[in-house]
Amino acid sequence: MRSAKLKFEKRRSRIRHKISKTSNRVRLSIFKSCRHIYAQIIDDSRSITIASASTLDEKITTLKKSYCNIDNAIKVGEAIAKKADSAGIKEVVFDRGGYKYHGVVKALADAAREKIKF
């Protein structure tokens, strides 16, 4: 039986392969740790990061022990959407990074979806 980490890595690579194969748009990539949430808009054709936002930004969060919650995910989603809008990006592909689409990931995606088309 495979370990949970190996299953997660396989799921992540399968999702990224499907995204890169089917689209020439930039992707909104999500990473979450136990304490923080990160979002990046990446152009794979040029291999550059266009915009990024996370709970490490002082404008987004206040002092707490853990920043990985739905309220902060909404703030990160709004921040990445604002940065994408200022960079002239109107359409992205959502890369959930192997995480289930619920909770923090869903909140971030819904907040970003208000300004960016998925």
From Swiss-Prot:
Q: Which GO terms describe its molecular function?
A: 5S rRNA binding; structural constituent of ribosome
In terms of PANTHER family, this protein maps to:
39S RIBOSOMAL PROTEIN L18, MITOCHONDRIAL (PTHR12899), LARGE RIBOSOMAL SUBUNIT PROTEIN UL18M (PTHR12899:SF3)
How does the record describe its quaternary structure?
Answer: Part of the 50S ribosomal subunit; part of the 5S rRNA/L5/L18/L25 subcomplex. Contacts the 5S and 23S rRNAs.
Q: Which UniProt keywords apply?
A: Ribonucleoprotein, Ribosomal protein, RNA-binding, rRNA-binding
Query: Which ranges of the sequence are coiled-coil?
Result: none
Q: Which organism does this record belong to? A: Rickettsia akari (strain Hartford)
InterPro entries listed in its UniProt record: Ribosomal_uL18_bac-type (IPR004389), Ribosomal_uL18_bac/euk (IPR005484)
Function text: This is one of the proteins that bind and probably mediate the attachment of the 5S RNA into the large ribosomal subunit, where it forms part of the central protuberance.
- Give the UniProt family note: Belongs to the universal ribosomal protein uL18 family.
Establish whether keyword RNA-binding is in the entry. Answer: yes
Q: Which domain of life is it from?
A: Bacteria
Q: Which GO terms describe its cellular component?
A: cytosolic large ribosomal subunit
What's this protein's name? Large ribosomal subunit protein uL18
A single BP term in Gene Ontology: translation
